[in-house]
Amino acid sequence: LMDFGADGGEARTPNIDALAGRGALFTQYRASPLCSPSRAMLLTGMDAHLTGFATIPEVLPQEQKGKPGYTMALERGVLTLADRLRAAGYRTIMSGKWHLGEAPGEMPQAHGFDRSFALAASGADNWDDQSYMPYYKDAPWFEDGAEASVPEDFYSSRFIVDTAIRYLDATDGDKPFFAYIPFQAVHIPV
């Protein structure tokens, strides 16, 4: 993969370049080779260790469990972009992969989202309501913090986008909105 044109890459990306020219470019973002730490950093603007997600729960060594940076829940007092935008009057929704905790107080509603349809696991099948790894028996989907299921004609990307649109259509269109849409299909099985 290469950078967008606005960031010096050789790919022609005129629409993205135009957006970049009218917006803000963030140049200090850090990614992790693991999904939860990357999402925690993206949502908070903080280093993964400070968020509580230095790794993912599925590979957390026993000796690190519960230690600072390895709580596998967003640390107390850590604010997400959704927290900040909701406080500024935005309607906030998320639809897609969460994997930042599924206990009470760890779901998206506890972190600034008005509405959410969230996959709490590291991943799930893109076509069926089932796990794609032996860590989980079922795919743990939640709507607004309550256990949920997906429809029979489920395809993850279509469902995630359709759910986000449904949430936006059901809210006050006069308010600005923040829609966080972390797709599941970037994970296996592709």
Question: What are the roles of these predicted feature ranges?
Answer:
Residues 1-190:
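Formylglycine-dependent sulfatase
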